[in-house]
Structures are given as structure tokens and as C-alpha cells.
């Protein structure tokens, strides 16, 4: 079962929803980088269950432990292992799923692929797998910010039929996004979204939506042509998140409604800085699979949570039709907790692209990177 991502900044996650623990091993992190454990924990706290009545009531602290690769608060160049223990599992709630498949869940496909599966908590298909990604991405986020000034901010753009009205007035900070439990910076729309989620929760149903994400301060040159395009890597990473069913960059599907003369992003030289900029950003910051220096703008679509508390028709392991009445603790809407997960996988793609570009083109690194003091302190 593939569980790794990245060419240079390589992330390998492990663990199941109701196992002893979940975690990640991160390879390719340069030596000498300060690891701020509180920053990793802060990111995990944004993702953790039980944080509001809009999410699953499973109450996990998701406290992270660093077990290797860090000495006296700094990376030493060896693999970094981060572990989070599972503390609040109720496996008996899943006993009826040992031989019964939840509609639209990975139960059936995992069974068909492997012939055996961990039915409790969804096993490896659970969103708890993303704990490892979020923890690893916290390290990536620190490096990207320190070296390049890159900041990645995601937010809930829609829930069901309720659409936010922020347009292209993108939030500039996580604090702006986290001002409400929905994680939508448009407060009026957030109230409507909250009401819709609670309505679905009361009805034993679920609802989906979209998340938008912007990465600021990307330099031009990240990504590779043809098979390793940055948007291709982003698409693969985003669509690997549980419940994610759609992805677009920049104008995305709405760009098909425009003409070339309307959609093309015209270049100009910015006065004062001499930087090449574009007057519009329909491309979402990517052209030919390579960043052009504008904001990276993406959007992801999430389906309604597949585990609901309504009776559903399904089949069992013998191929017999039956009725499923699901138990357990589940999110009525994954969107509020998916925001930090989206940020995480975007940062994992960006850090890998950055370290690769830095390795193959030292002149690019010298031109665009802000070399932090901790690199200068290395005794070589």
C-alpha cells in the first residue's frame, strides 16, 4: 500500500484510525533547521476532532512526539519521526461493518483490492491518516516561510448551496480564517453554513462543499514541464485527501466560459521592484506547470461525509443485500477540518518543488531565497 510522497522532502505516513498510533517519517530535511514543536502542535490542533459541535465528537488531544531526527531543537539531517497516539477509540461501534459495506465509503474497494481490511474506524482510509501529513507539513511551512516568505492560507468557500462572497479579496492570515468555527472569512455566509451543517447533523445526514487556497510570495520557477508540472503534483496531492472529489487551478472550469483575449494574463513590469507581474491571474500563478510569481490559487471540492446515520441499502461480504444503520462518531461536514489539511498538502508539494529547484539551480536559490541565519551557523 503506497504511503509515501515526495522526491527530496519525502513523507511516509503510517497508522490506522483505531490502531495504537499514527504518524510520519520525514526524510530530506536539511540539517540545522530549528524545529518549533509548538508550531507543529498548533497545526495539529486546527485539524483535530472534537474542536466544535460541527465536527465529530471523537475527543483526541493529538499530542505530537518527536522521536528522531531532532537534537537540541534542530534538525540533524536524518529522518524525523513524529508520532501521535490514538486515545479515544470505540471500536465496538464498528462491529456491524466487519461484513457490511458503507455506501460511497472505501470499505468495499479496500476489501476488493486486499481481501482483508481493518473495518474499525475506516482503518487506513480514515482522515486520521492526515495527521502525519499535517505534522510533516508544519516543518515544510516553517522552511518555506523562513527561506522564501511563502504563506499558504485556505478557507471554506462553500457549504452545500451556501457560497461565500469574498470574491478575490483573499484572507491574508489564519487568524482571519479561524475567527469562526466554520473557517469561512465571510462572517455572514459562515453563519448560514453553520446552520446548514447543524441541520444536517440533526437529520443524521451530511453535506459537502469547497475549499479555496492561496499561496502568497511564490517565486517564479517552481515546478517542472510535462510530467512533473506543479499543478499536476498539486492535483495528485489534493485528490489524495479523503472525501476530496474535485480540483481546479485559477479560473478552473469557469475559464472555459471566457475567450482567449479575456482569459490571457498580460505581463507588465512592476514599477519600483522591476518584477515581472501579470495584470490578471486566471492562470492561478501557474503556466506550463511552473510558477510565474503570482499568487497560487486553487480550489478543492469535498463530497458529503459518506458515513451518515440514516438507514441505507447496501450489501454484505456474501454479496447479499441488507440495510445498514451506521454507528460511531463522524463529521456531518468535513470542510472545517479539511482547511488545515489542504494547507498541509499544498505546503508538502511546494517544499519538494523548492528543494528540488534549489538543488538543480543554485543561482535561482541565490536570487530568490532569503538565507536564514541558521544556514550560516552550520560548521562545515
UniProtKB/Swiss-Prot annotation:
Name residues in a coiled coil: none
Q: Which domain of life is it from?
A: Bacteria
Instruction: Tell me the cofactor note.
Output: Reduced FMN (FMNH(2)).
Pathway(s) per entry: Metabolic intermediate biosynthesis; chorismate biosynthesis; chorismate from D-erythrose 4-phosphate and phosphoenolpyruvate: step 7/7
Q: Which GO terms describe its biological process?
A: amino acid biosynthetic process; aromatic amino acid family biosynthetic process; chorismate biosynthetic process
Quote the SUPFAM superfamilies the UniProt record gives: Chorismate synthase, AroC
Catalysed reactions listed for this entry: 5-O-(1-carboxyvinyl)-3-phosphoshikimate = chorismate + phosphate
Q: Kind of enzyme, top EC level?
A: lyase
**Cofactor(s) recorded in Swiss-Prot or TrEMBL:** FMNH2
Q: What is its EC number?
A: 4.2.3.5
**Record keyword Amino-acid biosynthesis present:** yes
Q: Which Pfam families match?
A: Chorismate_synt
Keywords in alphabetical order: Amino-acid biosynthesis, Aromatic amino acid biosynthesis, FAD, Flavoprotein, FMN, Lyase, NADP
Q: Name one GO cellular component term.
A: cytosol
Instruction: Check the record and name the Gene3D superfamilies matching this protein.
Output: Chorismate synthase AroC
Q: Which GO terms describe its molecular function?
A: chorismate synthase activity; FMN binding
Detail which positions bind NADP(+): 47
User: How the protein assembles, per its UniProt entry?
Assistant: Homotetramer.
Sequence similarity = Belongs to the chorismate synthase family.
Matching HAMAP family: Chorismate_synth
User: What is the role of the protein in this entry?
Assistant: This reaction introduces a second double bond into the aromatic ring system.
Name the UniProt record assigns to this protein = Chorismate synthase
Q: Which organism is it from?
A: Leptospira interrogans serogroup Icterohaemorrhagiae serovar Lai (strain 56601)
